[in-house]
Swiss-Prot record:
It is found in: Cytoplasm. This is SsrA-binding protein. InterPro entries: SmpB, SsrA-bd_prot, SsrA-bd_prot_CS. SUPFAM superfamilies: Small protein B (SmpB). One of its GO terms (molecular function) is RNA binding. Residues 135-151 have a biased composition (Basic and acidic residues). Keywords: Cytoplasm, RNA-binding. It holds the Pfam family SmpB. The keyword RNA-binding applies. PROSITE patterns: SSRP. Residues 133-157 are annotated as: Disordered.
């Protein structure tokens, strides 16, 4: 049963392949600057962040290649689906993320796009390092073994 004190968030888009393709070091919550039609489209649940990433430009962090489709009920004031979107972070957070990307060869990957309890659009951003093919195989073996172990324990018990 859900706890009443738990924050109520509505997940709009999730990057499910990110945990398989990347080794996640750290996560950070960032606000995202959206236009009105983008917010309505995201609430509709059609947006995807699977192929997107974050990059630094002119001392700011931008979300690149996130697909938020056009809002059908909007007319000529609609938005461009794959435009770069500014992420709202504190200066210390931006400097930390830019340092990790430049010095350590990390990548900024969005994990989840959601609305918090106040109705604000937020993006869970991960500082991650790309996995090699053998690392992916190893994590797949661990996952399969966990499933098999669960099956064996259920059959036995």
């Amino acid at each position: 049963m859900a706890n009443k004190n738990e924050p109520k968030i509505t997940v709009a888009a999730e990057n499910r392949k990110a945990r398989f393709n990347y080794a996640i070091e750290d996560t950070i919550e960032a606000g995202i600057a959206l236009t009105g039609t983008e917010v309505k489209s995201v609430r509709g649940g059609k947006s995807t962040i699977a192929e997107s990433y974050a990059d630094s430009r002119d001392g700011e962090i931008w979300l690149i290649n996130a697909n938020i489709p056009e809002y059908l009920q909007a007319n000529r004031f609609n938005h461009e689906p794959k435009r770069p979107r500014k992420l709202l972070l504190h200066r210390k957070q931006i400097n930390k993320l830019m340092g990790a990307v430049e010095r350590e060869g990390m990548t900024l990957i969005p994990l989840k796009l959601y609305f918090n309890e106040r109705g604000r659009a937020k993006l869970l951003l991960a500082v991650a390092k790309g996995k090699k093919l053998h690392d992916k195989r190893e994590s797949e073996k661990k996952r399969d073994w966990g499933r098999e172990k669960g099956r064996l324990l259920r059959a036995r018990g």
